[in-house]
């Protein structure tokens, strides 16, 4: 199994397709949020 597929597959089985879509969106938003925080931190500390 490749890394990309591992990221897309959630640890729990989604009850419906909508739950799966929401879960993926939340993961994407969380990654973007962490990236923004790290960028802001670098800008402030530089």
UniProtKB/Swiss-Prot annotation:
GO terms for biological process: negative regulation of calcium ion import into sarcoplasmic reticulum. Inhibits the activity of ATP2A1/SERCA1 ATPase in sarcoplasmic reticulum by decreasing the apparent affinity of the ATPase for Ca(2+), thereby acting as a key regulator of skeletal muscle activity. Its high expression in adult skeletal muscle, suggests that it constitutes the predominant regulator of ATP2A1/SERCA1 in adult skeletal muscle. Also inhibits the activity of ATP2A2/SERCA2 and ATP2A3/SERCA3. Homooligomer. Monomer. Interacts with ATP2A1/SERCA1. Interacts as a monomer with ATP2A2/SERCA2; the interaction inhibits ATP2A2 activity. The keyword S-adenosyl-L-methionine does not apply. This is Myoregulin. The keyword Transmembrane helix applies. The chain crosses the membrane at residues 22-42. One of its GO terms (cellular component) is sarcoplasmic reticulum membrane. The gene is MRLN. It is found in: Sarcoplasmic reticulum membrane. InterPro entries: Myoregulin (IPR049526). It comes from the Eukaryota. Keywords: Membrane, Sarcoplasmic reticulum, Transmembrane, Transmembrane helix.
């Amino acid at each position: 199994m490749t890394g990309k597929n591992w990221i897309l597959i959630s640890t729990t089985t989604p009850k419906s397709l909508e739950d799966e879509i929401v879960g993926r969106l939340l993961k994407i938003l969380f990654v973007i949020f962490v990236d923004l925080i790290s960028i802001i931190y670098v800008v402030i500390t530089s």
